Design a protein with these regions (language model features):
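A beta-rich soluble binding module of mature secreted/lumenal proteins
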Residues: 19-174
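Bacterial N-terminal signal peptides
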Residues: 8-17
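Bacterial N-terminal signal peptides that target proteins for export
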Residues: 1-8
Length: 174
């Protein structure tokens, strides 16, 4: 998928209406930052050609600001693409809600953005369930790109219990 298509799809997601759902009660931002690997997600058109996604979540000065770098390997040709965004915490009580805005020339002045919520996470922050506020898309982020199938199944059960769509699962790890 071309970068322009990815950015256009990301911008379109920003226009979708948000519905209120519960998210994780508290997120310790010091433990949440760092490198994550996307190991499972539901099918979405924005990422249809993406595998082995890696997310770097890096603090940027203020306590509620982050730089995001999503590295994706395209399935079709193995080409690596990096999408960069800035994130800010939008709920400082729970620290579980973020607004991601694309950076660079095609950021549309910061208008191309999307809300993401942390719906669940391991006590030791070894994994997290991220999703859109309306639950139409979700991702399992893990610290270990080679998480066992048994652990994946346990986390997927939690995703199912949270009410996310489970129709078309995509295993995105190695």
């Amino acid at each position: 998928m071309s970068r322009a298509c990815l950015i256009a799809a990301f911008a379109a997601l920003a226009l979708m209406p948000a519905t209120s759902f519960a998210q994780a009660s508290d997120v310790d931002l010091d433990r949440f930052d760092g490198r994550w690997f996307e190991i499972e997600r539901n099918h979405n058109t924005v990422q249809k050609d993406c595998s082995r996604a890696q997310i770097d979540f890096t603090p940027q000065g203020a306590a509620d600001r982050y730089a995001i770098a999503v590295t994706c390997t395209r399935r079709a040709d193995g080409k690596v693409e990096v999408l960069r965004a800035n994130a800010r915490v939008t709920d400082t009580t729970s620290n579980a809600r973020f607004r991601f805005s694309l950076t660079g020339l095609l950021s549309f002045g910061g208008l191309a953005g999307q809300n993401y919520w942390v719906y669940d996470h391991a006590p030791d922050y070894s994994w997290a369930v991220m999703g859109l506020p309306d639950k139409s898309n979700w991702w399992i982020w893990h610290r270990d790109q080679n998480a066992s199938q048994a652990e994946r199944d346990r986390i997927l059960a939690r995703v199912r219990a949270l009410g996310f769509p489970m129709g078309r699962l995509v295993h995105t790890g190695l």
